[in-house]
């Protein structure tokens, strides 16, 4: 039988795989139906996103990126709080957008269900300067960035 730590890390691995998959069903299947996604970057006026909002904005994500690679940076620095059922990872993306290369770094805090198999809450922190650069490049090409972009 797996330990709590092993279960938390297994779900985290599924999250990372799903995030880079370009498959909305895979992304949502590891979340509870009531999962809340906190985008913790107030300069973008994004606060809390539901699964339904993620699904609705996903076509814009697919239209913006041709390739989206997502992985954990420094896996040895992953923090696991078994009692709180939380995992914190530092991650990176390397992507090819319709307006050129895009790279960013993130901190994710994932809160899991009691059985550690699903994610019930996500907190995401990212480099807003890099995202603003992408936004400006999209706008310069008259491509709508949108308020509900899931990135």
Curated annotation (Swiss-Prot):
InterPro entries the UniProt entry points to: Fungal_Meroterpenoid_Isomerase, NTF2-like_dom_sf
**SUPFAM superfamilies assigned to the protein according to its UniProt record, in alphabetical order:** NTF2-like
Regions crossing the membrane = none
Q: Which Gene3D superfamilies match?
A: 3.10.450.50
Q: Which GO terms describe its biological process?
A: terpenoid biosynthetic process
Functional pathway: Secondary metabolite biosynthesis; terpenoid biosynthesis
The family annotation for this protein states: Belongs to the trt14 isomerase family.
Q: What does this protein do?
A: Part of the gene cluster B that mediates the biosynthesis of the fungal meroterpenoid acetoxydehydroaustin. The first step of the pathway is the synthesis of 3,5-dimethylorsellinic acid by the polyketide synthase ausA. 3,5-dimethylorsellinic acid is then prenylated by the polyprenyl transferase ausN. Further epoxidation by the FAD-dependent monooxygenase ausM and cyclization by the probable terpene cyclase ausL lead to the formation of protoaustinoid A.
Q: Relay the record's extra comment.
A: In A.calidoustus, the austinoid gene cluster lies on a contiguous DNA region, while clusters from E.nidulans and P.brasilianum are split in their respective genomes. Genetic rearrangements provoked variability among the clusters and E.nidulans produces the least number of austionoid derivatives with the end products austinol and dehydroaustinol, while P.brasilianum can produce until acetoxydehydroaustin, and A.calidoustus produces the highest number of identified derivatives.
Assembly, in brief, is: Homodimer.
Protein name, per record:
Austinoid biosynthesis clusters protein F
Gene (name only): ausF
